[in-house]
Amino acid sequence: IRNSEKQHIWVGMARETAHQLGTPVSALMGWVDWLRENPEKTLDIVEEMNADLNRLNQVSERFSQMGSTPKLEETDLSELVKTVVDYLEKRLPSKGKSLKLVNEITSKTNIYANITLLSWAIENIIKNGIDAITQERGEVRIRLRMEKEEVRIQIHDDGKGVEKKDLKNVFRPGFSTKNRGWGLGLSLTQRIIQDIHRGKIFIKQSSPGSGTTFEIILPT
């Protein structure tokens, strides 16, 4: 790798780390403000604050596992997705927007996975969908289809969609259409799915104004 490319990757990783820290830190600040206004409801919020503290710990774990050989273990995919959705649902942008996460994966589905990294990959796709919704109302829907020796996870958002000219670049390190993006989230997601879980990830459908559907294929 050329020095300029190495520098770009290091800068991108540093910024991606800051981006990963942003959600739990912002949430913790929000919970503190909420507690100041509602001191009688402390117990209701402690669990969510604890979830954000755990998330801060997960950020370092995620990056350390990317630099090692992660272990795969038998995992209930439905429970993994539910945990990701439950966390993000309580932290959806609310100012001027009405957003929904719809999780249609309910039946137990066992696969071999690294829970920390696969959760990160699915979270990245869902957050990408949330960011793509620029209108007042929108949703991100998660579905699962079982086939012979694989599972197919579809994550669809009804956001702005991807321009045809950009489709081939979405997983390229450094590519981003977001003003605050650094273009490593989807690149890391692709590596987690393909290199670590021996799966596939691609955009199944997308066009401006009609949203985007990502599909993840994982062996069972």
Name what the model sees in each region.
Residues 162-174:
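Short conserved segment of the HATPase_c
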Residues 44-94, 98:
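Conserved DHp (HisKA) dimerization/phosphotransfer helix of two-component histidine kinases, i.e.
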Residues 98-110:
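Conserved catalytic submotifs in the C-terminal HATPase_c
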Residues 139-149:
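Short beta-strand/loop element within the Bergerat-fold HATPase_c
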Residues 68-71, 110-113, 177:
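Conserved micro-motifs of the catalytic ATP-binding
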